[in-house]
Every structure is written in structure tokens, then in C-alpha cells.
Design a protein with these regions (language model features):
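General beta-strand structural signal in soluble alpha/beta enzymes
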Residues: 7-9, 37-40, 57, 88, ...
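Short, small-residue-enriched loops and turns at beta-alpha junctions
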Residues: 13-15, 118-119
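Pocket-edge structural micro-motifs
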Residues: 9, 66, 144
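A contiguous loop/helix-start segment that scaffolds small-molecule binding in enzyme catalytic cores
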Residues: 5, 78-148
Length: 148
């Protein structure tokens, strides 16, 4: 007791992260636990900045969604009908399904993987995106009527 420790994570420490689960477990066994969480720049903001693409403007709504939401889901399509952006996180398992589902629609798509890392990849070209390997640290930003 009385020792300090640190936990580091890749990604967003308090958004769909192991950090949140670990913190909850630690607080169950150590209710007096003191902790400090230092947030960095979240991945979707980093993608928007790296690509010079505004996430939302004016009355647009920003939705951050884990990619468990299926590409053909009515819920996803309802989200996409409103002005703003939907950012799907961790799209490594379903990226191509999203691309297939949204092909021919009037959406602005932007894919980002490993943002801020040496092997960062950003593209709005569906074919270039399809050629990428599955990447855990990946996201797909979808906007209706976007202005770049």
C-alpha cells in the first residue's frame, strides 16, 4: 500500500477502452483509490485535424458509435439522415461491409487508421481503404452533405 502506479493505453482512455473496465474493477477492491486520468486528443478529433475535415458545423450532431452497429442497421441509417457526422470506431472487422452498404449513397466517407502513429493512414478512396489490412485502431467518419 502507498505505492503509485501508472496505466497507459493506446486510444481514448475513457471511450470504449480497457481503462474504464480496469478502473471500475480497481474501485471495487480499493474504494479509496485516488486516480488521475490524463486525456490526450481523442482519435476522431485527431482524424478530423489530420485531414483538415470539420467533424460538425452549425447545427450538426456528432455521434461516436462502436462498430457493433451493423451497416444495414435502421438505427445507423436514421443517424445518417440527420446533419452531422457519425464516427464508427474499431471498424477493422466490418470496414468493407460499411463501404458496400454506403456505396452509391451521398455520404462523405473518411477512413483513418493508426492516427498519430508512424503508420497512419487516411483516405476517402474506397478502393484504397479496401486494400488495407484489418487495423484495430481504425475508424470511419461518415457525413451527409459534408463540406471539405
Amino acid at each position: 500500500m502507498g505505492n503509485d502506479c501508472a496505466f497507459t493505453t493506446i486510444g481514448d482512455p475513457m471511450t470504449y477502452s480497457t481503462c474504464g473496465y480496469l478502473l471500475r474493477a480497481l474501485r471495487r477492491v480499493l474504494p479509496e483509490l485516488e486516480c488521475e486520468i490524463v486525456a490526450g486528443v481523442n482519435s476522431w478529433s485527431a482524424l478530423a485535424a489530420a485531414s483538415a475535415s470539420p467533424l460538425v458545423e452549425d447545427n450538426g450532431v456528432l455521434r461516436i458509435v462502436p462498430s457493433y452497429l451493423r451497416p444495414d442497421s435502421p438505427e445507423l441509417h436514421r443517424m445518417l439522415e440527420t446533419e452531422g457526422a457519425v464516427v464508427l470506431l474499431k471498424t477493422y472487422r466490418s470496414r468493407n461491409e460499411y463501404l458496400d452498404s454506403l456505396a452509391g449513397e451521398e455520404y462523405d466517407l473518411l477512413y483513418g487508421a493508426n492516427i498519430g502513429l508512424e503508420n497512419e493512414f487516411i483516405s476517402s478512396d474506397p478502393e484504397a481503404i479496401r486494400e488495407r489490412p484489418d487495423e484495430y485502431l481504425s475508424m470511419l467518419m461518415i457525413r451527409k452533405g459534408a463540406r471539405r
